[in-house]
Design a protein with these regions (language model features):
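N-terminal Rossmann-like NAD(P) cofactor-binding module of classical short-chain dehydrogenase/reductase
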Residues: 2-5
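Glycine-enriched alpha-helix->loop->beta-strand junction motifs that scaffold or abut catalytic
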Residues: 23-26, 87
Length: 204
């Protein structure tokens, strides 16, 4: 049997998933918050009961990044990762850049179009990106990277002026999830970042 968890959050969802795994049922979930906070505990239960815990959809939706990290690049030593992992904030920042709109105007349009939740905190304050980075960095760097270790800054303080000044100098502002694994250990952060207009991520 396969159980698909769509509850969201950690409390009830985690209890439900634990119960299913203990019954030997494979679980599929897109719950990035639960996975970032509880994956090791849940994976131990799954292994003990000879069932699976699959969460490909928890990070970057249609891109099979988790499967790639697990199976496709195991022979590689990854030292750095960087990407745009939240569509809501990317839409808002792109709208601000293209139309010269302020943050609130761009947010309201995103909400009207269904790109942003009624309460957008999880996205615009960087929590969503933080959970995803915690999951991806843990896999890429082969060590548990707690979400609490991720330095987090959202986009709520970004102004149209910030974006316009960056544009004058040939830069684009994006909310990036950045992970580095060096001699001093793992560094993980989510924050608005100016990148050159010629950078591959600038046109995302």
């Amino acid at each position: 049997d396969i159980v698909i968890e769509t509850i969201g959050g950690v409390g009830v969802a985690k209890d439900f998933v634990m119960m299913a795994l203990k019954e030997g049922k494979t679980v599929v979930t897109a719950n990035k918050e639960m996975i970032s906070k509880c994956s090791h505990e849940l994976e131990r239960i799954a292994k003990r009961n000879s069932c699976g815990l699959y969460y490909e959809a928890s990070c970057v939706g249609g891109v099979p990044i988790i499967r790639t990290l697990l199976d496709g690049v195991q022979a590689n030593h990854i030292t750095e990762m960087m990407g745009i992992v939240n569509g809501t904030t990317n839409y808002i920042l792109t709208k601000m850049a293209q139309d010269g709109a302020d943050y609130q105007t761009a947010l309201k349009e995103a909400q009207a179009l269904g790109y942003a939740e009624f309460d957008p905190t999880n996205d615009v304050e960087g929590f969503d990106s933080t959970y995803k980075l915690s999951i991806l960095a843990s896999m890429a760097f082969h060590t548990k990277v707690p979400y609490t270790k991720v330095h987090r800054e959202g986009i709520t303080s970004v102004s149209a002026t910030d974006i316009a000044i960056g544009k004058e100098f040939g830069y684009v502002l994006k909310l990036l999830a950045i992970g580095k694994n060096g001699e001093k250990g793992v560094e993980v952060r989510v924050h608005p970042t100016f990148i050159p207009a010629a950078h591959p991520l600038a046109n995302v």
